[in-house]
Amino acid sequence: MGKIIGIDLGTTNSCVAIMEHGKPVVIQNSEGGRTTPSIVAYTNKGERLVGQVAKNQMVTNPENTIYSIKRFMGRRFEEVASEIKMVPYKIEKGLNGDARVNISNIKKQMSPPEISAATLTKMKETAEAYLGEKVTEAVITVPAYFNDAQRQATKDAGKIAGLEVKRIVNEPTAAALAYGIEKKHEEIVAVYDLGGGTFDISILELGDGVFEVKSTNGDTHLGGDNFDDEIIKHLISEFKKESAIDLSNDKMALQRLKEAAEKAKIELSGAQEASINLPFITADANGPKHLQYTLTRAKFEQMVDHLVQKTKEPCLKAIKDAGLKASDINEVILVGGSTRIPAIQKIVKDIFGQDPNKGVNPDEAVAIGAAIQGGILTGETKDMVLLDVTPLSLGIETLGGVMTKLIERNTTIPTKKSQVFSTAADNQTSVDIKVLQGEREMAAQNRILGNFILDGIPAAPRGVPQIEVSFDIDANGIVHVSAKDMGTGKEQKIRIESSSGLSESEIDRMVKDAEAHAEEDKKLKENIEAKNTANSLIYQTEKSLKEYSEKISSEDKEAIESKIKELKESLEKEDISLIKSRTEELQKASYKIAEMMYKDSSQQNANSQQENGPQSNTSEEGKEADYEVVDEDKK
């Protein structure tokens, strides 16, 4: 088997590593750098430039130099409004609704995976030059909070680059592998990963070569780019006050400001102030204008404090989801170039009550971890097991608009969960399966990832057909859903790849609303279930009453019919307490039918029961979509 390379496909920079003689090695690129700028440019001659050479000409070619493309991976055009404002190149809506880049120098609209593939190709060629052999397989990392579409887009980029992506690994998990490869004792670590475009926090338990993720959280719209953007906005504002000239619409000036902002941010990690000098930034009737400004660390920290604070809540949630206290964490590992910012290191200390561990290189740890995972897959790295998780719950919509969760968030992957449903109406021949992602009890308050229809179900009374719905999340975190009519064997499958990236507000809403409205959701769900139970009992009782009407007394029959009528009236009034009490009354009144059914069954099937074992009545009132739950696979 050939080498499987490990690639950190970053927002700002990318890095490639391999396992060599049992040790991970970071490979230098052709320019001598251990990391490569994730930048792709097209010259006016149509030539493609990748990495540092692309970065070198970005000021003079802003509209055809693509950076931070990771922010657009797997996202719909409507979801990237804030990102569009941060880049000088043109983002358009693709035919399928996704975000595309219009590159004027080659008169072409390109997808984010196509552009990312250029960076991956550079990483592939870097590894091939070092190894002296062809490379066809890779492990590529993604932010832990990347959704299914973003993961799929990353796999697509690998395929375009000529790589078979053997595994998609979450970045914090990869960093933990890099940290723990030589650790023998058990410990709990937190990985705080603030990169160029995304933020992740993961809590892991390490011990005996097992790396088990306990929880993960994050924000796919928060990273170093946002810190740069705050400096840019401040410089534009100050320059406008001084010269009455607005630089915000000058793309070449913006590119120079971007470069200067990034440089100042880096400088302020080690100094108390940074000088920004941009001669000939623009010109007016009076001649050329120069931008000169001194940015202090105190002013910078004031400007970005709201961004720093945004990392706190995900950390607290991850600790809570792991069932731990901050004091239980043995080490906090910092990953991503933005963690060099002193204000970030301070908030990490405030959250976890300890100084962060600086033993891993924040720029290289993720690629090293990816290489280790590659070694695990080839068998070169032995006695190491990686257990990752899915970041958000997955389920389907059931009767009354309820979300029935099949896989809870922070479930270890790969995993497969199944549940058996049935039809909600007599002679129903198809069901519409709506696949949801989120934490709320009601379907409408979660995100629809996709839907599909299972048809060809034989006409039968409701509750009779058995439809098994299965959710399968592979080791890459990619979701597959299937529905199977257990009577006919007919099956329908879907791989969720039509979904796009969750926006910052959507992720925030899913989790925050779930906590804020937990009681409200619980009550609403209980009310719907009470109505479903009542309706199901009425249906079953009326059906049995017809079947056994001749075998029960007229008095019992009248009593049962009276209770059915009363329960129907309470359903019309939507009085939940009355519905519950009258449901109990009808259940008690219908015991007479149950007695008749049992007596009849005992007489007619005595011989059959001796041969096949006791017949159990497993009919069960349950949740209904276009169907109701009749069984559950408790894996």
Curated annotation (Swiss-Prot):
Entry GO MF terms: ATP binding; ATP-dependent protein folding chaperone; unfolded protein binding
UniProt cross-references to InterPro entries, sorted A to Z: ATPase_NBD (IPR043129), Chaperone_DnaK (IPR012725), Heat_shock_70_CS (IPR018181), HSP70_C_sf (IPR029048), HSP70_peptide-bd_sf (IPR029047), Hsp_70_fam (IPR013126)
Disulfide bridge map: none
Superkingdom, natural source: Bacteria
Reported induction: By heat shock.
Chain intervals for the UniProt region annotation (Disordered): 597-635
Biased composition (Basic and acidic residues): 620-635
Family recorded in the similarity comment: Belongs to the heat shock protein 70 family.
Function field: Acts as a chaperone.
The protein's name: Chaperone protein DnaK
Taxonomic source organism: Borreliella burgdorferi (strain ATCC 35210 / DSM 4680 / CIP 102532 / B31)
Lineage: Bacteria, Pseudomonadati, Spirochaetota, Spirochaetia, Spirochaetales
Gene from which the chain derives: dnaK
